[in-house]
Amino acid sequence: MVKLTTWLKKIGWGETITQRIFCFYIYCILFGSLLLFLPIALQDNYQKVVSYGIDWQGKRFEQKTDYNFLDALFLSTSAFSDTGLSTVVVSKTYSIFGQIVLAVLLQLGGIGFVVIAFLAWRLFNFHKKEQYSFYEKLMLQSERGGSKLGNTSEMILVSIIFLFIVELIYGFLYGILFYFIPGFEPANLFADHAKVSTQLKALVVDSNQTIAAFNDINKAFQAGFFHSLSAVNNAGIDLIGGSSFVPYRNGLGIIIQWLTISQIIFGGIGYPCLFDGFEAIKKKIKYGRHTKHQFSLFTKLTVITNIVVILLFFTLLLMVEFIASDSLTNTIVNFSDEKKSLINTQLQSQSNQAIHASVFGNNPNASRVMQLFFMVISSRSAGFSVFPVASEIQTTKIIIALAMFIGASPSSTAGGIRTTTLAVIFLALVAKFKGQKEVKAFKRSIDQTTVIDAFLVLIISLIAVLLTAVLLPLSMEQPVSFIDALFETTSAFGTVGLSSGATVNIALDPNRNTFNFLALCLLMVMGQVGVSSSVLTFVRKHPKANSYSYPKEAVKIG
């Protein structure tokens, strides 16, 4: 009986800090699932909209199917992990109550459940001088803290206040922009014809119908504040429609893109970096501009790695887009007469250049460059899309998948293996090639345990993502390529939310394969918690210590 009680305590609460945080997350997801499964959370009684838009003939379509608890669990996991993958069109499936539940889950997952509890405790005990315990400090550090325990609480308070202010200001800005900028519903460029590839079928042009938020003050600010909350938490869920930010891919929509980019960076850079920046500004104000702030190794590695990764992937996407013969730009410019006969009848008589402008706007090349830059930033963890991902060629999908796999920074709202992991692995390889015994960066030596952990994170992440990508298509009725399956699993692990269409296929799968739902949910939680913390969940509080050691012997490898 005692053993059973002990086991139940371990399952329900956990022994270690990591186990308890993991349990908090699971309970929040399950509770959110129950709320999203209530009839009050849905617009239509247990029906979900899986696709919505305008077809190539200009007719509005809406595809519905049954809504079940797996959908609620998937959306709750996606929202709490700040991923954005969805089996439904959120704005057409959930009621105001359901959208509020999603917003709360986004905020809880982005800021952190333990951090929210800490803020609530500070709010209701502001008049007391009571100090929180060493254990509570460890809980905060484990979820959103940096490497130093002493300044964890101050760092979290500063970062949260800053992010809340950003959410409010940007919410008002988005509301104004959504109200005044006429975002048009995207219409399919091609007919659903057997001769047209999946890539070309996904191409869109603007229809003559605006989105619901345009000239509607209530819907504009509702969508604005929801988007602000989603963007700063790097979630990728929106209330615009079924095509993410495609209505704002050109023209004045670029203003919204730049605002979103800045929020994604604020949310994904990590609390330690935000606090470091705050400390630097505070010192400049207090002691003058001649004072030099000593930035932490974490901040230096994070900022430099982020810049390098963004520039690298942006350059790769530009090269593929403007050099590859089968890229979207070159494909449209070189449309054959056979292809043109299958497109929207209103565009058939136009030149290829005019059709190209219809897809990419009045400044096609500039718009396409901006779209690719937005996709690079968004693919780091956010998941907003200004172009249908399914229309991209396989090479582009692989590049975006690599960016999603890396993710953004630790102690942030982002997922993936994290930028610091990549930086440590790169520095370790450089040290090995130079014959150095220590891994060094900015006049600091990185602990050997950290180096080993970085390689473990990489290996475990690769195994989890690749294994799921191999198994995912096997149980689906509709054919899905390995690249698309890999894109989907990487998106889940990186808590990004970009989709090549596989998630919709899962939602439409008549077999209702539970494995696909749960596998992606598991990857989303792993990406949110972090691989290191996920592995530590299974570590005992007091591991059995060996009182002996064996002789060492070299083993030939490679």
Swiss-Prot record:
Give the CC-aspect GO terms.
plasma membrane
Q: Which residues form a coiled coil?
A: none
The answer on whether this UniProt entry bears the keyword RNA-binding reads: no
Kindly give the Pfam families that the UniProt entry links to this protein. Answer: TrkH
Stretches that traverse the bilayer: 21-41, 69-89, 100-120, 160-180, 220-240, 251-271, 303-323, 386-406, 413-433, 454-474, 479-499, 519-539
Is Oxidoreductase among this UniProt entry's keywords? no
Query: Topology versus the membrane, per the UniProt entry?
Result: Multi-pass membrane protein
Q: Which UniProt keywords apply?
A: Cell membrane, Ion transport, Membrane, Transmembrane, Transmembrane helix, Transport
What is its subcellular localisation? Cell membrane
Spell out the molecular function terms from Gene Ontology: potassium ion transmembrane transporter activity
Q: Which BP terms in the Gene Ontology apply to this protein?
A: potassium ion transmembrane transport
InterPro entries the record matches: Cat_transpt
As for family, the record states: Belongs to the TrkH potassium transport family.
Q: What is this protein called?
A: Uncharacterized cation transporter MG322
User: Lineage in the entry?
Assistant: Bacteria, Bacillati, Mycoplasmatota, Mycoplasmoidales, Mycoplasmoidaceae
